[in-house]
């Protein structure tokens, strides 16, 4: 959306409208798979994200209804993205966010020139819902029910931590224990995490007890708990490969067990619940339970929280607080901005 808005010199309002449409598609499509696409080995960031990006691109290109349908059909035929990266911490995890956006623009531009695609790309017997679902476990009603009236993306989450969104619950619980009880990491005997089945599948496979790189750290429940108790936080500073060989971190990882909680599994995927219990060397136990992690629409962050997160990350990248504040000021009045390319000039000029 930002790339096309830059090249087409679209206004802030144009950008907001296009992104809203794309976000609605990705949320509805993801919901239709009932939380199970992962079990089929597909990566929703890529598979659902490409369909969303093609709608955003079509809107920015000013395509009519028929050509927007073509764009969806073309994009659906180009969808890809496997979860294979998860066992090796492969960088294809990153690729599967940018690659679908690139292909979505290609799909929309092809449609703009009259190249057609299947109009029933979602519901066809050989379409996306069947092909990418786990054992045909999907519900097509979520694609169109209340479309244009009930904006489902307004209930999507904002990530608080620089790692997998499924990590939010147990990290919130760990840091709640830290804030309330101030346990010394050296005195922790063991850590137990209760979670849903898929969260375990993603973050607590046996290989997650031996992380090797930064991507692994972002998808390792034992590491995240260990470093949260050691450092009392989980920021980009904790995504440091030096910690992999830290003796205390290694001991805490080895002391961590993860078990499925039947109630949390029943509530998934509507809720990403988690609970953490630590046992100290003197036998004292501390527990925290999180129904909905921070950033969920039922446990929301504030706009200021989001801005501060951006400031923290942008200042690390740019080393220039003046530029960071210029970006914040631009976005604060995004709906009144006549030319999105001005924002991209601020964002892209990294030296």
Where are each of the predicted segments found?
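Short alpha-helices
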Residues: 1, 50-54
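Hydrophobic alpha-helical hairpins/lids featuring a short glycine-rich hinge
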Residues: 1-34
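Active-site cavity-forming subdomains of large catalytic enzyme subunits
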Residues: 10-14, 31-41, 54-75, 82-94, ...
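Terminal-appendage/accessory-domain detector
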Residues: 14, 92-102, 109-351
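Short acidic/histidine-centered micro-motifs embedded in hydrophobic/aromatic stretches
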Residues: 18-25, 71-75, 194, 330-331, ...
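Alpha-helical scaffold segments in carbohydrate-active enzymes
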Residues: 21-28, 56, 74-81, 103-110, ...
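Active-site histidine-anchored catalytic micro-motif
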Residues: 44-50
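Short, surface-exposed loop/turn segments at secondary-structure boundaries that line and modulate
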Residues: 45, 77-86, 197-205
